[in-house]
Amino acid sequence: MKARELQELRQGSSPQDLQEKVQDLKSELFNLRFQLATGQLENPMRIREVKKSIAQIKTILREKELRAFEQ
């Protein structure tokens, strides 16, 4: 995920939207792992990218939670 996309997620997305995005990425990760197990995966680096994106979005969610708690 590019820095610009992350910035847009930080500023313009609600926590519900971010949760939906995490769920979509988790289902994609499941499918990628299934393809890996069956030998059909074309781009193994995609697994790493998806895991990193999930972590980045979860970090944004946590930042929003802490910001809301402080106020």
Curated annotation (Swiss-Prot):
| Designated gene of the protein | rpmC
Give the residue spans that cross the bilayer. Answer: none
Family the UniProt entry places it in: Belongs to the universal ribosomal protein uL29 family.
Any one GO MF term held by the record is: structural constituent of ribosome
List the protein's name.
Large ribosomal subunit protein uL29
An example of a Gene Ontology cellular component annotation for this protein is: cytosolic large ribosomal subunit
Which CDD domains does the UniProt record give?
A: Ribosomal_L29_HIP
Listed HAMAP family: Ribosomal_uL29 (MF_00374)
| UniProt entry keywords in alphabetical sequence | Ribonucleoprotein, Ribosomal protein
Q: Which Pfam families match?
A: Ribosomal_L29
| Highest taxon of the lineage | Bacteria
Q: Quick one: where's region Disordered?
A: 1-20
Lineage from the top down? Bacteria, Bacillati, Bacillota, Clostridia, Eubacteriales
Q: Which residues form the signal peptide?
A: none
The cross-references to InterPro entries, in alphabetical order and at most eight, read: Ribosomal_protein_uL29, Ribosomal_uL29, Ribosomal_uL29_CS, Ribosomal_uL29_sf
Report the record's Gene Ontology biological process terms: translation
